[in-house]
Regions:
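Structural preference for beta-rich elements and adjacent junctions enriched in aromatics
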Residues: 1-205
């Protein structure tokens, strides 16, 4: 979808919501301890220079305390995208809270991250319906969306493959209703998103 690269991010959000297939993040792996299940949906597409992901979330608790790069955004109302390119033993993790704050790295396993620099993170375009100012947890009924654009050049590509491995998450570990939703099952005893052996196949529009 090369036309996406020409649009401002708010228009990209609208385009993805209207024209691209949507998928639910519906797997509650650790239901006995973390049963809360907000609605979380994503769509994904590629332009000529960027990979786009759009998230929509409906939840009862909204939190965005972290606002600096590479902080613990998974404590907040958070969505995540992990990807692994063909023939690579590394994977990339991109974690965003609802105001677009980013924790991102590439690595071979959980213990050895190579975190993205501030300059690298600045190349990731974001559009957050909640704005970009931090706030403490609120309780109610909230709908929010986040659209991100990851440049191919950031992950060392000039063009993006039509098929990759990856996984999508919705979490919020420090809210009153902590939860860990997954697009595809992760068969571990405890929540652990850094398990590339459970990544699924992603075909890009």
């Amino acid at each position: 979808m090369p036309e996406l690269d020409k649009l401002p991010m708010d228009a990209v959000c609208d385009y993805l919501e209207l024209h691209v297939s949507k998928y639910g993040i519906n797997c509650v792996n650790w239901k006995d301890r973390f049963p809360y299940h907000p609605i979380a949906i994503f769509s994904i597409a590629r332009g000529e220079k960027y990979l786009y992901v759009n998230y929509f979330v409906r939840c009862n608790y909204l939190r965005a305390v972290n606002y600096e790069n590479n902080k613990s955004v998974s404590e907040d109302s958070c969505v995540e995208f992990f990807l692994q390119l063909p023939d690579s033993d590394e994977y990339w993790n991109f974690e965003f809270n609802c105001i677009g704050a980013v924790n991102a790295s590439h690595r071979k396993d959980r213990k050895h991250p190579c975190r993205l620099s501030d300059d690298e993170i600045a190349t990731i375009k974001r559009y957050a319906s909640c704005g970009n100012k931090p706030f403490n947890e609120m309780e109610g009924m909230f709908n929010w969306s986040l659209t991100i654009a990851i440049p191919f050049s950031l992950i060392g590509l000039t063009a993006f493959p039509a098929e990759i491995k990856g996984i999508f998450y919705k979490c919020a570990s420090a809210t009153k209703m902590p939860h860990y939703l997954i697009w595809a099952p992760i068969r571990t005893e405890n929540p652990d998103f850094h398990r590339p052996e459970f990544f699924g196949k992603i075909c890009l529009e």
